[in-house]
A protein has these predicted regions:
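Soluble accessory domains appended to multi-pass membrane transport proteins
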Residues: 1-88, 95
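Long, non-transmembrane cytosolic or organellar matrix-exposed soluble domains/tails
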Residues: 78-176
Length: 176
């Protein structure tokens, strides 16, 4: 309940109070009526599930989306992203990137491969083409979740240029 400063786990409920231990270990007491009047997020579904969801989008520069061509395909095979017969020069580089990203996520030891794994385009925007990475991490503990998620995205950021793609970045007051 953000308005009440309550963001954590309910520790005790009585007729007149609800005691919440926040994630920073502070204790907040709110009335039961506050829970009825305001919205709140119930984390129990995530805690009881087989994974914690990651849904993050990265904007790609439209000017760098194009058919892969022979040279890019050869480079992707040479770097081990694909086998020689898997890709053709007329396939768009973003398509190849999405295919590889899904395969990478499905094989990552921290990703729950029995749950949904999807790398897909969202509605184009002025900031570029948003591509959403949607998957579930097996380790739901906050610190491990954050580190595992960041490790995955740092790798995604690092390999983007290998596919001839560029992440959109808005430059204000300086040259690109």
């Amino acid at each position: 309940v953000p308005k009440a400063g309550a963001d954590g786990t309910v520790e005790d409920i009585t007729l007149t109070t609800v005691k919440v231990r926040n994630f920073d270990n502070t204790i907040v007491t709110v009335t039961p009526q506050t829970l009825v009047d305001d919205s709140f997020k119930n984390w129990i579904g995530m805690q009881n599930s087989d994974g914690r969801r990651v849904a993050r989008k990265i904007y790609y520069d439209f000017n760098h989306i194009h058919p892969a061509g022979r040279e890019l395909c050869d480079g992707l095979v040479e770097k081990g992203y694909f086998n020689a017969g898997e890709i053709t020069p007329d396939t768009v580089n973003l398509t190849l990137f999405r295919r590889y990203a899904e395969r990478y996520l499905a094989g990552h030891p921290e990703v729950n491969s029995s749950m949904t794994i999807m790398v897909h385009q969202l509605e184009p925007a002025s900031l570029g083409l948003p591509v959403e990475f949607y998957f579930f991490l097996s380790d739901k503990e906050w610190l491990n979740y954050e580190h595992n998620r960041d490790d995955i995205f740092e790798y995604i950021y690092a390999i983007t240029p290998d596919f001839g793609l560029k992440i959109y970045q808005q430059y204000i007051g300086r040259e690109a």
